[in-house]
Amino acid sequence: MSAVSVYPMCVRASRGLLRLRQGARCSTAPPLLDVVRPLSADTSSSSATGGLAQAILQERLQQQQKSQEQPPPEGEDSGHKQDEQGEDKKQKENTAYAKKMVLRLAGIMGLGGTVGIVYIFGSNSVDEQGNKIPDEFDNDVPVIQQLRRTFKYFKDYRQMIIEPTSPKLLPDPLREPYYQPPYTLVLELTDVLLHPEWSLATGWRFKKRPGIDYLFQQLAPLYEIVIFTSETGMTAYPLIDSIDPQGFVMYRLFRDATRYMEGHHVKDVSCLNRDTSKVIVVDCKREAFGLQPFNGLALCKWDGNSEDRTLYDLAAFLKTIATSGVEDVRSVLENYAHEEDPIEAFKRRQAQLAREEEQRISEMAQQKKQGFSLGTIAGRFWSRKQQ
């Protein structure tokens, strides 16, 4: 082989290596293939020097492809993971710091509120001239005075909610020449006499139950009618005025007169200042008369039905008790204590009594008829014998 033929092959090989480096920089496969193709064509017509150049180029090409296919070094992945862990740690630290600051702020506000409450409610009461009113805590240390007065204030406030406002909720019975009815009827307002309804157009409204006027007119001569409701006075007072324009209701008692027990407003009959054997409580909740269960009559809750006749039947039931002169109403109401609808039970028993009375009358009439026929035959026989 001449030197002339070797020189072009070396030039071509160097050019191929240069192009290979440029192809590695742009990282595209087609230029590398273009380099291989002309070299392979040249090596087919040249000597062993061209084969050596082709082998070098193919080795470089394979190294470049392997470098592209290999994943990034583990050092880079660990670096990314460390960065992410650092960010998560920083975020957790910020969250913990924010929680700590919120708790500190809440503690400071709570402490300040407690100090303010003790200062406001633990101070001495003052009279109209602004002078302090002495109490049983004046001899204590100032801080102890504030704490004990605050405790007493909230204790009295709780007692005011739980206990009735007075041990005697009603005044003493009327004396002659005034008329005092022999029995006392205690009525609930909500869902017994009225039903609250709400609409978007009118807001809250109270529907009057059919038979209220009839109930008051029939029972006013026999019962001392008292409205005792778990509603507040501000809500109930105008409602009572609207349903009782003639003044049949003698007294009105509201939520503050109830005894708060286990989440219910209980009406304590013993605080009414009346003979408990003559008191009947009408409500739709049995818990309302839980302290004296045999003084109560639990009606079904009225849902606003305009065809309801319960108050008419209730008037008949209560009128029957009063006109019968029952000495202790608890002996009668005890029979209806476990009835889901005592008025329906009363109507069933009344119908049964009516059937029994009709049967008794018919039997008596039959006996009289038989006695009359036997007497007539005996009289005729006796008159004939004398003749």
From Swiss-Prot:
Q: Where is composition skewed (Basic and acidic residues) in this entry? A: 77-93
Which residue ranges are assigned to the Mitochondrial intermembrane compartment in the record's topology?
A: 122-387
Q: What happens when the gene is disrupted?
A: Massive apoptosis in the CNS, probably due to loss of mitochondrial function and increased cytochrome c release.
Q: Name one GO molecular function term.
A: protein tyrosine phosphatase activity
Which domain of life, per UniProt? Eukaryota
Which residue stretches are annotated as topological domain Mitochondrial matrix?
A: 27-100
Q: Where does it mainly reside? A: mitochondrion
- The segment(s) forming the FCP1 homology domain are 178-321
Q: Which Gene3D superfamilies match?
A: HAD superfamily/HAD-like
GO cellular component terms, alphabetically, are: mitochondrial inner membrane; TIM23 mitochondrial import inner membrane translocase complex
Q: Where in the cell is it found?
A: Mitochondrion inner membrane
Q: Which residues cross the membrane?
A: 101-121
Sorted UniProt keywords: Membrane, Mitochondrion, Mitochondrion inner membrane, Protein transport, Transit peptide, Translocation, Transmembrane, Transmembrane helix, Transport
- Spell out the residue ranges making up region: Disordered: 61-93
One of its Pfam families is: NIF
Could you describe the subunit structure of this protein? Component of the TIM23 complex at least composed of timm23, timm17 and timm50.
Name used for this protein in its record: Mitochondrial import inner membrane translocase subunit TIM50
**Protein's organism:** Danio rerio (Zebrafish)
Instruction: Supply the gene name.
Output: timm50
